[in-house]
Structure formats: C-alpha cells, structure tokens
Amino acid sequence: SPESQFTHTPGLKVVYASTPYNAKGLLIAAIECNDPVIVLEPKRCYRGPFYGDPHNVPTWKDHPEAQVPESHYTVEIGKARLALEGNECTVIAWGAMVHVAQAAIRESGISCDLIDLQSLVPWDMEAIEASIEKTGRCVLVHEAPKTRRFGSEMAASIQERCFWSLEAPVNRVTGWDTPFPHTTEWDYMPSPARIAEAIHKTMEE
C-alpha cells in the first residue's frame, strides 16, 4: 500500500485526508511545511463520504465537513480529529475508512470514540492515549492488508504506550493479505459489518 511505502521512509511526513475540509487544510499545511510531505487522498471520498455500501454512495452536499472556507486555513500536521465521541471503545481510522467506521459504530450500538488520524507521520499519540485511558479498548481500521503495514506499527506502539490502560488486546480490521482484486473490491474492503463485529469482540474480551 502507498501509505506503508511512504510511512516507512524516514524524513517524510505523511497526511491522509478524509473530508473536503481537511483535504484543503492539510494540503496548505503541507505546502507551507519546510519538510517533505506526502498528501494522500482516497478516491473513494471524491464524490461523497463512503459508508461502505457501494450501492448507496451519498454526495458531500449538506455534509458539515464539506463546508470549505474560501479563505486561508490549515489543518495541523500531527493532530488527529475526534470524529465521534464515546466512552466504551476507541476506534482509529484514516481516509475513507473513517466514514465506514462511523457506519459500523452506529450498527454496533457501542459508544465509541472515533479518531480520524489525519496525519500518519507524525501521528497524534497523545490523542490516542487520552482516548484509550477513557475507554480501555481499541480497534484499528485500515484498508491496506494486515501484515507488515503501518497499522502493525501503530498497534505495537499502542500496546507499549497504553498497556496498563488496555482491558483487551488491540484489534485490527483490514484488507486481506492478497493482491488488490478490482473485480471483488467490496469483498476486500473492511465493511461496516466486519468492523462492528470487531468492536463487539473487543468488548467481550
């Protein structure tokens, strides 16, 4: 996955947009940054917030995060966004998976913090630690394969930094460890049902 290739390169900063608002803010922040910054944009979010149903893709019209000021603004590199607030489980996602995770949280009925990472390198470990101290549980969601990915490093860091706060192991919902199959794309991608199942599993551990 491109995110793994770039995040494993020392010296690069990597940001990942999930909405029109943070896409503009992160891009301007990247332009103004003195360091090299890779800006990743999920094509799945070009038309609207993708909630995991390929037959029902809404547009950005009337979505609060689609209101993009014409004036200059930036989204700080290295700072996460709290997309949903809860108290039972922390769900961490980035890019298009933020919206799929939102749908999954609604489906699960579990009160969850949803952290939109926004910045992969550096990532906002303080926001993650604060959330896990509150919830005691964590689910990571990304569309890249599971093995040897950026999410693996993040899960390891969370286990190290939040060990005494965690009441269950960090759970991950990812793409499969296969070449990306365009003809069966929707079977490959993490779905709301898979994420909701992982949230329930984490709550039971």
Task: Give the predicted meaning of each segment.
Residues 11-14, 21-67:
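Helix-enriched interaction subdomains in cytosolic or periplasmic regions
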